[in-house]
């Protein structure tokens, strides 16, 4: 799930990071992940897509064209599973571990408390990675953001100044 505002923030963030020569790593999920990758490509950047199954099984299927474009634009797709491995639910959580492990930090646009993004955050905390989130008022789609903010566990970015301060964390 991702709001229209979250989609725009994700796209703009991906584009900005690409223009600053920062690679974007995510799991090709629908919503914020997809928009961040599209923005990164539009900005001339490189994307790394982490798959929860074998490289022959792009999930969600609707992102097949995006996955192809990532590879054609000098990005890559990574899986820890052999070709032909069908996806199982636990593999999504393992994918979240890889997303964090391959990243310098984790940026949360919108995350519900019970979401894959929160798995990625937990792995990032255990790996001593930088974690930041955007602050916005869409409580129903950003309850995970709020929880982390209230616990004082992350840097909170304001929309307008957030992108510049992100690279200074």
Per-range role (PLM):
Residues 1-169:
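Glycine-biased, small-residue-rich flexible motifs in mid-sequence functional cores and linkers
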């Amino acid at each position: 799930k991702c709001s229209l505002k979250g989609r725009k923030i994700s796209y703009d963030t991906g584009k900005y990071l690409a223009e600053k020569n920062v690679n974007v790593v995510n799991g090709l999920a629908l919503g914020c992940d997809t928009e961040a990758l599209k923005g990164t490509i539009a900005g001339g950047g490189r994307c790394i897509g982490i798959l929860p199954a074998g490289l022959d099984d792009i999930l969600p299927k609707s992102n097949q064209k995006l996955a192809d474009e990532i590879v054609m634009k000098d990005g890559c797709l990574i899986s820890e599973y052999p070709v032909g491995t069908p996806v199982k639910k636990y593999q999504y959580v393992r994918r979240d571990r890889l997303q964090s492990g391959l990243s310098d930090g984790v940026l949360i646009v919108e995350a519900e408390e019970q979401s894959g993004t929160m798995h990625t955050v937990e792995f990032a905390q255990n790996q001593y990675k930088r974690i930041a989130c955007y602050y916005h008022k869409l409580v129903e789609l950003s309850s995970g953001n709020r929880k982390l903010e209230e616990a004082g566990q992350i840097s909170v970015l304001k929309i307008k100044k957030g992108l510049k301060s992100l690279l200074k964390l």
